[in-house]
Amino acid sequence: MTILHTALALVPLALYLGAATLVVRAVRADPTARPLSAVVVAQAGVLVHAALLFRAIDSPGGVTIAITDSASLVGWVIGATTAIALGFTALGALSSVLLVLAGLLATLTGLLGGLSEVDVPHWELTAHIALAALAAGWLTIAVTAVLLLSWQDARVRARKPMGSLALLPPMETMERTLFQAIGGGFVVLTLALVTGLFFVHDLIAQHLAHKVASHSQSGSEKV
């Protein structure tokens, strides 16, 4: 990983952090704020993140992806989902937390290039990986919402000062976001499993066809 690549990997992190900061500033003044500036900066981060990912995994034979690239892809899903949601729903500090998480995962892009890469020659496997990353991203959003919601609920029950938790959206919004992320995540995860089964079935069929062809060829040579 070159110094230039390292520097480029920090660009989406900087953009995501910038968007998160803009959200926090806006929410301090108005809890229902949906700052356009944060949406624009977050979307810029998503675009740069996508460009870096494409550069890292694109290869002449199709797609070559490392473990760190998979994690970065999950981060891209989190960042893209949050950037879109920012324009429609006041998620408060929840969106800031998710953007920071997306930025941290973006720094993993190409980190282990050449060391743990796996070639993905078949479109079925590419679709499976993409759907799995989408499901993982949405389920990560759900887990983040659960943790923050639990912390928020514990503070309310203990009647302690909310502190920075006051910047989170109302519990109803948190719960709705949680269930939407879980529902979408499991639907996409089911699709990922289906595409995985298709790929395995196709792989087995190809293996059997190759085995039969090899057996027939060896039989012909004996005759």
Report the location of each language-model feature.
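Membrane-interface helix-loop-helix modules in multi-pass inner-membrane proteins
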Residues: 48-97, 201-214
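Transmembrane alpha-helical segments of integral membrane proteins
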Residues: 21, 193-198, 219-223
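Cytoplasmic-side transmembrane-helix entry/capping segments in multi-pass membrane proteins
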Residues: 33-42, 66-69, 92-103
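Hydrophobic alpha-helical segments and helix pairs
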Residues: 84-134
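Hydrophobic transmembrane alpha-helical segments in integral membrane proteins
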Residues: 1-16, 135-139
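A mid-sequence, solvent-exposed acidic-amphipathic segment
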Residues: 155-199
